[in-house]
Amino acid sequence: MKRYLVCAALAGLVITLSMVLQPPISYNGGLGWDGAQYTQLAGQCGREPMHAYEPFTYRVGAPCLAALVPLPPKLGLWTINILSSILLLFLLDAWLRQHVHLILVPYLLAGFAFHWLTPLRHVWWYPTSVDTPALCAIVGALLLTETPVAFAAVCLAGALIRESVLIVPLGALAGSFVRLAPPNLVAKAGRMRTSAIAGIAAGVAGMVIARLVSTPDTHYSLPDAAYYWALHKPPLAYLLAWFITFGPALAVLAAHWKAAAAFLAEFPEYAAMLVLVAILAWIGGSDTERFLLWGSPIILVMIGKAADRIDWRRARGLLAVLAIGLAISGRWFLIIPDYWPEAPRAWPLLTPWTAAHYELLFSHTPDQAMAAVALGEYVALSVVLVGWIKWHARS
């Protein structure tokens, strides 16, 4: 019961602060970019033929759920996103408790919940996205990997929301061929392979259903887009995106990388999923951080495994510096700014504190000089933290 109270209290606190402090985006009447297409689909579902720009037109799951809410389409999507963001916290709690020392779980959840990119914060700025229910489906699928029927059902529903959910069954299938050890693991690999095949089939079925019920207004070539970003995404911007998404907690992971590597060796399916996420984040588009967030359930476990190797009672100074760094980089107490391309430059301290344009927060910021400074700050802080952790381990 206590764990549920912690999740509820954390969700309530973040939601209350966001309601009071975070103004929603004003661009395109508050609908944003892809959100305008999802809002259009929500208004069409059950009333008229569904159509929107490609590839957004095939992500019909969340808009059709929003159509069931007796509110205008935008508010319906917002409602689905708020409920999904709360559900996600409970799902993450269940997921982390399977792999991480229980005492660390509330801290990992708090760091996730307060980060400006994660759903409990982000849906109050961008209410019409479908990423939040998709992330719920990803974590739900991770929890059900060895139960084929339930796993397939989640993959089917998830693929209707966003095709990214397929990273879970694809990773599970790859991992099932690597688990070649004791008989109990071989049996587990067989169950996982069955679930993975069922999940892939269900996910593909979901994508086919989406293409039968919704048609594109424009043409979009996924191979062309992937080819473009594979060639044109700057490597340093890609590295910065990892720091923006996960902050200086990556230093903990780097300092005790063997603990994280042991986890991935024990569960190769998660390693395969991370590889898929890393590739998609590179070739998927300019929103690198949004793609990396799909791997956050696994990254959080890896950070937890590494953090468990540190005696935090003897490293309170380290803990204080790390906590401050996480709060600053995650903008725990700073709002997400609106869309204002003409906004003045905002120099960063990990994050640009005074930024008045949301693009300045991302790795694809138009101000690449500012991005270079931010990356240098992240690297410098990480070097200090890794050295500090290593010193504590020796003392």
What are these regions (language model features)?
Residues 18-22, 30, 37, 171-174, ...:
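Membrane-lumen/periplasm interface segments of specific transmembrane helices
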Residues 18-50, 66-70:
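Extracytoplasmic loop-helix module adjacent to an early transmembrane segment
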Residues 320-395:
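Transmembrane helical bundles and short interhelical boundary loops of multi-pass, membrane-embedded
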Residues 91, 131-153, 298-302:
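Specific aromatic-rich, kink-prone transmembrane helix
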Residues 138-142, 149-175, 201, 279:
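Membrane-interface alpha helices of multi-pass inner-membrane proteins
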Residues 79-100:
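Transmembrane-helix motifs of polytopic, lipid-linked glycan transferases
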Residues 89, 95-96, 104-127, 139-142:
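Transmembrane and membrane-interface helices of multi-pass
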Residues 117-137, 158-167, 295:
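Multi-pass, polyprenyl lipid-linked donor-dependent membrane glycosyltransferases
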